């Protein structure tokens, strides 16, 4: 089935009114209302109880409902990443040439109040139906240019062991070198999901990358650290991603502590994201000028091992954009006539390099 045929089928199905297929077209107001219930996992509640002062508040702010969520700004929309234009099926997004995104479920262990798929998560759609999974497998087999698949949702690890293993075996049947990225918040929200059986299975399914979403050093309790160490010890590469959130982790000290701790655990800090323009998330958004200033300081304090890529998903489907390009503008001067550029060095002096 071609992408065009899949897209036409998706539009037809939307007309049938299946809730789990039309969330991207919801109004911003409906997404920002009280639709996304407050839901906190026992493991995360335990982390909150263990944390002190500002750390406890930072964790609570991520999962506890606040009235500010009802405020919708003009720039916000239900589908801030513009995924709708790239949908092959309602559960598969093919935005980049060599990789696709699969929504395996609409369920999460906890509800992040800044979620950019809050309309989808609010519907709490269950595990992807078998017929939808088979359409994805068919598409992957017909599209050999796809070398990676991001398995996301929701959180894929909310599925049963049988569901997860069946899905991963189906994906692995496509090609032995298809890279599977497991995008999950379970490391912090539900570390018990990483059983020895699951880790052994993921080893069997290599190449598999674990992509945990971790925002604050207080999310790295002893159990969470043990999970990451177990994954790394089993030979599973782990690359984290974090979202910059006002009142949670928008300080140099907090982020330096987090990224250094992850690196010590063998986890590569992958991305630090500027917040997406999802409805009702404005209170979490750090002004871009502050973000760039913060990252410049992080760059001075952290090595390449510990420093993540600063990025934003451009609204409307423009894809990931490295904000490093903006952060370093003031540190670079181009000399076209001299066929060279000058850059500010670590000592503050300017140095010239020829084209």
From Swiss-Prot:
Alphabetically ordered keywords of this record: 4Fe-4S, Iron, Iron-sulfur, Isomerase, Metal-binding, Pyridoxal phosphate, S-adenosyl-L-methionine
Cofactor binding, note field: Binds 1 [4Fe-4S] cluster. The cluster is coordinated with 3 cysteines and an exchangeable S-adenosyl-L-methionine.
Any Pfam family hit: Radical_SAM
MF GO annotations: 4 iron, 4 sulfur cluster binding; isomerase activity; metal ion binding
Annotated ranges, domain Radical SAM core: 93-308
Cited PROSITE patterns: RADICAL_SAM
InterPro entries, sorted: Aldolase_TIM, Lys_aminomutase/Glu_NH3_mut, rSAM
Identification of the protein by name: Putative L-lysine 2,3-aminomutase
SUPFAM superfamilies: Radical SAM enzymes
Modified residues (N6-(pyridoxal phosphate)lysine): 320
PANTHER family: L-LYSINE 2,3-AMINOMUTASE, LYSINE 2,3-AMINOMUTASE-RELATED
């Amino acid at each position: 089935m071609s992408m065009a045929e899949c897209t036409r089928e998706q539009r037809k199905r939307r007309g049938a009114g299946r809730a789990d297929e039309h969330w991207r077209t919801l109004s911003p107001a409906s997404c920002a209302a009280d639709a996304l219930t407050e839901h906190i996992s026992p493991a995360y509640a335990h982390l909150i109880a263990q944390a002190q002062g500002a750390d406890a508040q930072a964790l609570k702010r991520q999962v506890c409902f606040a009235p500010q969520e009802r405020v919708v700004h003009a720039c916000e929309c239900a589908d801030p990443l513009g995924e709708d234009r790239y949908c092959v099926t309602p559960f598969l997004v093919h935005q980049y040439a060599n990789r696709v995104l699969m929504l395996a479920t609409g369920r999460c262990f906890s509800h992040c109040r800044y979620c950019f798929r809050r309309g989808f998560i609010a519907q709490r759609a269950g595990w992807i139906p078998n017929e939808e999974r088979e359409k994805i497998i068919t598409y992957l087999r017909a599209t050999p240019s796809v070398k990676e698949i991001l398995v996301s949702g929701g959180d894929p690890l909310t599925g049963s062991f049988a569901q997860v293993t069946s899905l991963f075996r189906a994906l692995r049947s496509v090609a032995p070198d298809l890279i599977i990225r497991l995008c999950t918040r379970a490391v912090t929200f539900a570390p018990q999901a990483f059983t020895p059986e699951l880790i052994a299975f993921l080893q069997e399914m290599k190449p598999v990358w674990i992509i945990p979403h971790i925002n604050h050093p207080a999310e790295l309790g002893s159990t969470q650290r043990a999970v990451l160490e177990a994954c790394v010890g089993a030979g599973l590469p782990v690359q984290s991603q974090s979202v910059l959130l006002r009142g949670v982790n928008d300080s140099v000290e907090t982020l330096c502590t987090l990224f250094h701790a992850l690196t010590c655990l063998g986890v590569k800090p992958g991305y630090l994201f500027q917040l997406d323009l999802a409805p009702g998330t404005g209170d979490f958004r750090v002004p871009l000028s502050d973000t760039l200033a913060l990252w410049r300081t992080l760059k001075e304090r952290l090595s390449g091992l510990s420093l993540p890529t600063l990025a934003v998903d451009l609204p409307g489907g423009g894809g990931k954009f490295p904000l490093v390009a903006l952060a370093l503008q003031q540190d670079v001067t181009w000399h076209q006539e001299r066929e060279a550029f000058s850059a500010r060095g670590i000592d503050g002096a300017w140095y010239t390099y020829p084209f």
